[in-house]
Every structure is written in structure tokens, then in C-alpha cells.
Amino acid sequence: MLNYIFIIYSYIFARKNFVLFHKFLYHISLRGLGILNHHNSYLAGEKQWLSRYLKNINNPIVIDVGANIGGYVNDVFEANISSFVYAFEPHPITYRKLNNNIANDKLKTFNLGVGNEKGKLELFDYEDNDGSAHASLYKEVITDLHGKGAVSHSVEVIKLDDFFMDYKIDTIDLLKIDTEGNEYNVLLGVEKYLTEKKIKAIHFEFNEMNIISKISFKNFGIY
């Protein structure tokens, strides 16, 4: 029956005159499905999920890779005040904002990038808005995807496997990754802990930036 309705609808409405109408339906349907609701963590569903997941865990250990100015960190503490958060933010301007925004003795911040190997890399951001939420290790995210001029910062990058061993962190309750296209490399750098099943949950961003880094969901499937 439903297929029959689709066929009839196509006969009547699959016309040039209805293109704008169907584009409108498409975009509001995406929002209804929870896609592209990035205006705040409530609309995105992140806030509700954090509350459900963290509320019954005693003293959860949370790793925030790509902490930006601390919005996610605040949501974590709202979900469970006993959380201990390790937050990584490589951009020097954004890192200062992060520390100014949140004062909590259960938060440790690090002005570091995270990837699949230790070293130094260039972090790119908007020439006219340095310190944005779109800073990326991929210059094309700024120049091609967003069509803007880019400025760069040399940043130190670490592997999480090394960091966890140095800080004697045995189990991670939640690993959050939002690195504007570098999410897969972050996971490659924590392969030991993933293999040993020491990370209970992973929350990562996947969007158009992954076109630039040439990563698909199939890559993440190995984990």
C-alpha cells in the first residue's frame, strides 16, 4: 500500500514546480530525524544521552578530545557532578577560553592535540575568526569546505594510549571525540585500550569534515 502511495505521489509531484517545496520538506525531515540539530546540545540529543548514561556511574572518567570552550564538559558535570574530566584542546586561543569558562577541581585541561602518533602538526583556523569551533588539522576544512582564508598554529600532538599509561588511567567510562575530521586518527592512537576493552563508550562527531580526511563509517567498523 505504501509503495503504491509513493508511485502516485511521484506521478503528481515529481515536477520542477515542486523542487523548492521538496527541498524544504527534506531539510525539516532531517531535523525531525535528529540530523543537523547542532545549534545546542539539547537539540542534538547529547545532553539527554549524557544524563542517561552517566547518572548511575560512580565517579566516571571522561575524556574530552576537542573540548573547545567547554560546552561538553559542562554537560558532563551537569549529568554527574562526581565525573572526572580530562579535556584536550590544541588551539591556544580556545584553550584559554576553556580555562576561563570552567573552574572545577575535577577537570584537568591540556593544550594538546590528539592523534595516531606523537609529534607536532599544524592546526588551521579562519584567518578572520581565529579561535573558532572549526579549527582542524586539515587545512582544506577551512579553505575548501568553508571557503575562507586560513591561519595556522603549530601544536603538540599525543597518543591517548601513551597518555593513559603515563597518568595510570586504567578504565575510561566515556571517550568523546570532536576534532573536525581527525576522529579516526584519535582512535588509531588508542588502539591498545580499545583492544583491551578498557573504554566503555565512545561519542564521536562524523560529518562533512570526514570527506576532507577521506574517512567513511566503514573505517570505524574495525572497532
Language-model segments: residues:
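Phosphate/nucleotide-binding beta-alpha loop and adjacent structural elements of enzyme active sites
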Residues: 1-223
